[in-house]
């Protein structure tokens, strides 16, 4: 009886501040849950079947997670719907947008073999993203704006271990890279550079 009350309170709290929720949980939400829920930021919560249904929904997709993780995933869902934005991530963007494997490991959801990387505020323009992999690569990269505008890139690389693609930023804003690849593939480096 106490858990449903706690959830009801969580959904009416103001959006949480960066670092309130562990980074690993934020990455998990943004690589698994947000792929469906980022389009639902209408300012309303659509849990028509009640709190128990939302718990069942989270457990069905995220697995049998610890109660604290489950609570944080519910808070992230509420934040996405209320603020119509990704939850703030307490991550320093490396100088020159050159990410190494150590930094990328913090932004990796091993269960889904997916990464969610904040690129920071990008001015309007054309950019080149270069991904360094541990060998043959097959996956999907998405560039996502703060307003949830998403551009998909299907990536395949035979064996060189490096693949690049170009993307366009229409309006200056915060941007993110979400990348999902096959099991056993590791993102070792990421380099984002202006291409104009």
Enumerate the language-model features and the residues they cover.
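Gly/Gly-Pro-rich "capping" loops immediately C-terminal to redox-active cysteine motifs
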Residues: 22-26, 38-63
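The canonical Cys-X-X-Cys-His
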Residues: 29-40, 73
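Noncatalytic modules at the cell exterior or secretory-pathway interfaces
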Residues: 126-128, 168-182
């Amino acid at each position: 009886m106490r858990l449903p009350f706690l959830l009801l309170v969580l959904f009416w709290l103001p959006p949480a501040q960066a670092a309130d929720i562990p980074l690993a949980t934020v990455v998990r939400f943004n690589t698994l849950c947000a792929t469906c829920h980022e389009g639902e930021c209408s300012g309303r919560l659509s849990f028509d079947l009640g709190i128990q249904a939302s718990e069942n929904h989270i457990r069905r997709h995220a697995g049998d997670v610890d109660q604290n993780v489950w609570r944080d995933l519910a808070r992230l869902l509420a934040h996405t719907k209320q603020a119509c934005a990704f939850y703030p991530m307490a991550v320093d963007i490396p100088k020159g947008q050159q990410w190494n494997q150590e930094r990328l490991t913090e932004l990796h959801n091993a269960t889904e073999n997916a990464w969610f990387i904040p690129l920071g505020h990008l001015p309007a323009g054309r950019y080149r993203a270069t991904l360094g992999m541990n060998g043959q690569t097959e996956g999907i990269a998405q560039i996502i704006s703060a307003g949830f505008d998403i551009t998909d890139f299907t990536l395949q690389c035979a064996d060189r271990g490096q693949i690049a693609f170009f993307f366009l930023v229409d309006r200056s804003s915060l941007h993110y890279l979400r990348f999902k690849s096959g099991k056993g593939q590791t993102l070792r480096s990421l380099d984002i550079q202006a291409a104009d």
